[in-house]
């Protein structure tokens, strides 16, 4: 059996490339939501810092848990919006995800793909950061978890981001761009740019970095036709970047 055939055998319900999964007005609404997030991100960067934060920080640490909870709520709300549009068009959550794990073989395949992809993903992040140079934007460093409760909530928020953002951007948006007639490369690029812009609160350089990472996620989704490896890598990357790497490298 060829490698591609073996991989396809683990797919219970692959994402159907080029198929419209929600109405065009619904897509316009999604993009309007993204526009609002870009505007809020711009205001966060250029407005006064929240709480007792220094000028170089978006907010003081006392705001960490409330911000975690708001971020999780916004992610689930965005996924719910996508699901409503897909459901009205006759789809399900599997329309967005490409299906869940059904066998241990599929778990092993997806984890085997996720591990090297995460290493390449991290390398790309460091490389783009290096190319862009020093970042003068306000950072979220003061919001990183310190206490056990904050760490546990952070892990929950990371898992939420992995599930919701992958389904929203790679499952919904990338599929809709393909249905508009964009080729695979154009759809992957477009959703990656929108994904980066949704993180505009981190400043323009980080927006560029996140756009590149979003393109990589989109390429993985286009290849695998499901989001299982994407979700694993996304959630793990957030846990690693926001908490675990600071324990390992301190």
What is each of the regions a protein language model found here?
Residues 12-13, 118-126, 130-250:
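Transmembrane helix-loop-helix hairpins at the membrane interface
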Residues 22-30, 63-71, 106-110, 150-154, ...:
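Residue-level signature of transmembrane alpha-helical entry/exit and packing/kink sites
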Residues 1-104, 126, 131, 242-250:
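N-terminal, membrane-interfacial amphipathic/helix-forming hydrophobic leader that caps
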Residues 96-100, 105, 143-146, 230:
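Surface-exposed loop/turn and secondary-structure junction residues enriched for glycine/proline
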Residues 98-119:
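Interfacial segments of alpha-helical transmembrane regions
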């Amino acid at each position: 059996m060829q490698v591609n055939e073996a991989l396809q055998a683990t797919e219970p319900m692959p994402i159907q490339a080029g198929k419209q999964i929600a109405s065009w007005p619904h897509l316009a609404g999604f993009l309007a939501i993204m526009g609002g997030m870009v505007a809020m991100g711009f205001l966060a960067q250029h407005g006064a810092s929240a709480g007792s934060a220094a000028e170089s920080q978006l907010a003081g640490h006392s705001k960490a848990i409330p911000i975690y909870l708001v971020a999780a709520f916004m992610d689930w709300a965005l996924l719910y919006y996508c699901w409503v549009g897909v459901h009205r068009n006759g789809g399900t959550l599997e329309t967005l995800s490409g299906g869940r794990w059904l066998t241990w073989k599929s778990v092993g395949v997806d984890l085997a793909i996720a591990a090297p992809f995460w290493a390449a993903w991290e390398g790309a992040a460091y490389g783009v950061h290096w190319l862009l140079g020093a970042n003068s934007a306000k950072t979220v460093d003061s919001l990183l978890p310190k206490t056990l409760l904050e760490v546990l909530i952070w892990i929950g928020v990371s898992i939420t981001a992995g599930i919701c953002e992958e389904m929203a951007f790679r499952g919904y948006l990338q599929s809709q761009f393909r249905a508009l007639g964009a080729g695979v490369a154009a759809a992957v690029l477009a959703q990656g740019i929108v994904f980066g812009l949704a993180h505009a609160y981190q400043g323009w350089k980080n927006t560029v970095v996140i756009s590149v990472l979003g393109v990589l996620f989109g390429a993985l989704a286009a290849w695998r036709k499901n989001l299982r490896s994407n979700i694993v890598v996304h959630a793990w990357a957030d846990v690693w970047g926001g908490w675990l790497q600071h324990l390992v490298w301190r």
